[in-house]
């Protein structure tokens, strides 16, 4: 059985990237929450 995590840069940024987070209202909420918490990295 193959492992569940098969790294792929393009898919990673499409799903978890900054642009994809900015494209939806809830994604912007995620970024706001991470800024409020003081995360060094906001998105993938």
From Swiss-Prot:
Q: Does the keyword Endoplasmic reticulum apply?
A: no
List, in alphabetical order, the Gene Ontology terms for molecular function in this entry: structural constituent of ribosome
One Gene Ontology CC term in the entry: ribosome
Please verify whether the record's keywords include 4Fe-4S: no
Cite the Gene3D superfamilies for this sequence.
1.10.287.3980
Q: Which family does it belong to?
A: Belongs to the bacterial ribosomal protein bL34 family.
Name recorded for this polypeptide = Large ribosomal subunit protein bL34
Give the species this sequence originates from.
Bacillus cereus (strain ATCC 14579 / DSM 31 / CCUG 7414 / JCM 2152 / NBRC 15305 / NCIMB 9373 / NCTC 2599 / NRRL B-3711)
